[in-house]
Structures are given as structure tokens and as C-alpha cells.
Regions:
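Acidic, surface-exposed loops and disordered segments
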Residues: 1-174
């Protein structure tokens, strides 16, 4: 599949069939993340793969809204770092996360980015801190997002190229 088509097809999937993800597919997704560009090549990320049903369910309650797809995912990847390791950790982790999502799409899997950084649970506690507690992460580790992964159990149409927001682009000469 060419890259443009891959980007056009990549959508957020929030419903999954429950069918497991092949270990080789998970490895390819992680390899894609590990090959991502990073500022000064510091590679500040730490990826935590979660397949345990109870842990997925617990992570789905880490923030007040929007995390329920984690509970129904076949697997999830917590995208984490210690901010002290790099001043570009947010950018580096964001790049690696979308590259992993693109790899998942290319493999025929669905994914959705569940934002944890700067989000709170129903009691006002930081979602990132909840993730650290649930996953047993070292002190100082921040969770940018959790990627919920699985075989899609919903249809999503590709982006309609005719409906792109070209009004938000300037300086392009035709």
C-alpha cells in the first residue's frame, strides 16, 4: 500500500472484535515505534505492551472520559517516558505513537490514541499518574497516551479528499 493511501485509510477505531493480535504483528508495531525519529536521537520512550484483560480494564478507568476502548482492545501500548530524559519527549513520543498507529493500519489492525497527559480521572487525579500506578512504572514516568489495538469491529470510511480543510493551508502555489 502506498503511504498516501495508508494515511487516507487510517482512522480511529474504538470497537474491536476481541480476536488476539499475533505476536509477530505486535513486534512489527513496536519496531516501527523504535525506529521513530527523536530529538538528538535520545529515544526517551518506553513502550509497555498490555494484553492482560484486568490491566486493560483498569487502564480504561485511568481518566474520566474517552478511555473505554482500552477495555475492549486485544492489546494496548502505553507510550511513556521520563521527561528528565529529553526536552523533546512529548514530540518524540507523539511521533512514535502515530508511526505505530500507521504500522497497525498497514497490518489491517485498528487503533485509537487515548490521551493521558494533562487529563484527569473522575476525582481530579492525573490520568498519567493512574497509568503509572496501574502499570508499576518508575517514579517520574509520564504516560503520554495509550494506544488501544485490535481487529476492528466497526466500519470507518477513508478520509474524503474533497473535504480536506484546505482553508487552513497558506502559501501553496498552484
Amino acid at each position: 500500500m502506498d503511504f498516501h493511501k495508508l494515511v487516507q485509510l487510517r482512522r480511529s477505531y474504538r470497537k474491536f472484535t476481541g480476536e488476539p493480535i499475533d505476536a509477530a504483528q505486535l513486534k512489527l508495531i513496536l519496531e516501527a515505534g523504535l525506529m521513530s525519529p527523536a530529538g538528538k536521537r535520545k529515544n526517551p520512550w518506553r513502550f509497555i505492551v498490555i494484553e492482560d484483560r484486568e490491566t486493560l480494564k483498569a487502564l480504561s478507568t485511568a481518566k474520566a472520559q474517552g478511555a473505554l476502548p482500552i477495555a475492549g482492545a486485544a492489546a494496548a501500548i502505553a507510550v511513556t517516558a521520563n521527561p528528565a530524559d529529553s526536552d523533546t519527549w512529548i514530540e518524540d513520543l507523539s511521533i512514535s505513537a502515530i508511526i505505530m498507529q500507521l504500522q497497525a493500519q498497514e497490518l489491517g489492525l485498528g487503533s485509537v490514541w487515548i490521551q493521558m497527559r494533562l487529563r484527569d480521572d473522575e476525582n481530579g487525579q492525573p490520568a498519567s499518574r493512574n497509568c503509572a500506578r496501574i502499570l508499576g512504572l518508575p517514579e517520574g514516568t509520564e504516560t503520554l497516551c495509550v494506544l488501544a489495538l485490535g481487529h476492528p469491529d466497526e466500519e470507518r470510511k477513508p478520509y474524503d479528499l474533497e473535504k480536506l480543510s484546505w482553508e487552513k493551508v497558506s502559501g501553496l502555489t498552484k
